[in-house]
Regions:
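Metallocofactor- and cofactor-centric catalytic cores in central/energy metabolism, strongly enriched
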Residues: 1-133, 147, 155-160, 166-168, ...
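Structural motif
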Residues: 87, 135-137, 191
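Catalytic alpha/beta core domains of metabolic enzymes, predominantly
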Residues: 170-200
């Protein structure tokens, strides 16, 4: 498979590792921070940190917005679903995040809360249209790159005159986190590793 099999070419990996070792000044320590949990997963899955010279260090950054979400936000979402009888729509990766009192959205669903896993904010809007007698709340989460779909669904709801749809907005901004890390951390990275999804 293109761009998968290439990762398994041992000769190419050894050549690249040797080039990195040759370029890295042994008198200097290099610190790179991967920002997103997806980056961390790729580095670990393919063993990339194991081939780096000892003076080239990867620092795990803030991670995923789901993992950074304050417990109180999950508690608030559960309260909406359990006590206000709303249809709470969320992405699958939020379902098992631990919340207060040993709860999670998954456990709240097991207790009778109407929590639905969706793939797109538009799925939540369609649920609202199909259930006009119920309030449908989209539990919006993600880095700032996920805010446009949230904005689009709100605009679509307004244009369609849907009155039983709302958003519990929990988007996370990356610049504040990076600024804090770059200013305050003793082991701060020289280079944060960003991509087109997260970062400039």
């Amino acid at each position: 498979m293109k761009y998968v099999d290439e990762y398994r070419e041992g000769d190419a990996a050894r050549r690249i590792a040797a080039e990195i070792g040759h370029e890295a000044d042994p008198k200097r320590i290099y610190r790179f921070m991967e920002f997103c949990g997806g980056h961390t997963h790729v580095l670990a899955r393919w063993g990339l940190t194991d081939i780096l010279p000892p003076n080239v260090r990867m620092i795990h950054g803030p991670g995923c917005p789901v993992c950074e979400l304050p417990v109180a936000r999950i508690d608030m979402a559960m309260q909406l679903a359990l006590e206000r009888n709303v249809i709470l729509c969320t992405y699958a990766d939020t379902m098992r995040v631990p919340a207060g009192k040993g709860m999670s959205l998954f456990k709240a669903k097991a207790q009778g809360a109407d929590i639905r896993m969706i793939y797109s904010p538009m799925d939540a809007l369609e649920l609202a249209k199909a259930n006009p007698e119920r309030e449908v709340v989209f539990f919006a989460i993600g880095f700032e790159t996920t805010t446009p779909p949230t904005a689009v669904v709100l605009k679509a709801a307004k244009a369609a005159g849907v009155k039983n749809f709302s958003v519990f907005c929990n988007h996370v901004l990356t610049p504040a986190a990076m600024t804090h890390i770059l200013k305050m951390s003793e082991e701060r990275p020289e280079v944060p590793v960003l991509d087109g999804l997260v970062g400039p």
